[in-house]
Amino acid sequence: MDVSTKLFGTYFATHHGLVRTRELLAFGYDDERIRMAHNYRLLVRVRQGWWALPGTAEILLRAWRAGGRLACVSALAFHGMSLELGDRLHIEVSAGSHGALKPGMCVHWSTSQANGDRRAVSLEVALRQASRCRVTTTAPPR
C-alpha cells in the first residue's frame, strides 16, 4: 500500500466513510482521478455526489442511498447494542427530504440532525427514537 492510498483511507476515516465529491476535489482529486478510482473499484458511488470505499458496511450504504443515516434500533445495533432488529432498516432523514421511502425501511423524520455523524444518530438520540418508534410510521410529521 503506497502513501497516497493510506492518506486516502485516512481521509475517508476522518469523514466516517462517506465523502462528498466536493470534499474529494478539495483533497486534491480532480474529476478524472475520481472517475478512474471508481473505474478501478477503489471508490464506490453511493449516490450522486457521494462516495465510499469498497468494504463499507452494506447497512450504511443502504441508509445513505435512501438519503439518510442509521436511526432508532438500526443505530443502536451500530453502536454495539445487541438487538433483534427484524427486517426493517431504520433511517433518519430531514423533514424536508423527498424520495427516502424505500421498501423495508422505517423512516424517522427529523427537523434537527445535529447529534451523531454521517453514519448514524448518536446513542442518546437512537434510544429516544426507539422508545417512541411505531415501525409502521413512515410519513413526515405534520
What positions do the PLM features span?
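Short gly/ser-rich loop at a beta-strand->alpha-helix junction or flexible surface loop bordering the NTP-binding
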Residues: 1-142
